[in-house]
Amino acid sequence: LTPQGWMKDGSVLISDGKILEVTNSDLAVIGAKVVDAKGMSIVPGFVAMNIHGGGGFDFSECTEEAFHGAVAAHQKHGATTIFPTVLAPEIGVIDKAVTVCEEMMRKKDGPILGLHIEGPYLNPKMAASLFIDKENPADPKEYKEILERTDCIKRWDSSPEIPGALEFAQYLKSRGILSAISHTEAEFD
């Protein structure tokens, strides 16, 4: 698959893990290892942006073992870039996730580019499956304390009807973090 669409037959030249050339013809490179991919598809790596775990592991466990296990499961199926989604019924879960994520992001060429947080500023009527059973107003002291010491959070979901959620979204935007609406009773209007 190329930006121009599907290519029926052709060759891909890879050196040191980088694609050097994609062509409709056969490539003859002296000393190159040839992999016959007839009947297969070659596609760019997948970006997993809302992924809670995999391979029997849950990112919300907030352990290196869970992160490694889930990442390995997704890499096996073509994900090259992963934004682990962590369900956070309370702010302490985010602290743990940040610690593990920062460690994983220190690894050169690692697949994790940042965290996606769901909670705790969600409508409890719409987030019961996340173990959020009470309204948690978006507390600037709480979220600023976390965001001022890390840059690994790339997306943070909240329900706009929660007190303080609009200010929270504006703060996220000011820091270059994607603010997403989630688990809400809000309507389009």
Descriptions of predicted regions:
Residues 53-65, 128-136, 178-180:
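Active-site mouth loops of central-metabolism enzymes
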Residues 12, 17, 39, 50, ...:
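Divalent metal-coordination and catalytic microenvironments
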Residues 1-28:
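N-terminal metal-binding scaffold of metallo-dependent hydrolase/deaminase domains
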Residues 105-110, 174-176:
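Short helix-capping segments at alpha-helix termini
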Residues 136-189:
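Histidine/acidic residue-rich metal-binding segments in metalloenzymes
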Residues 71, 95-102, 143, 169:
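Generic structural signal for well-ordered alpha-helices
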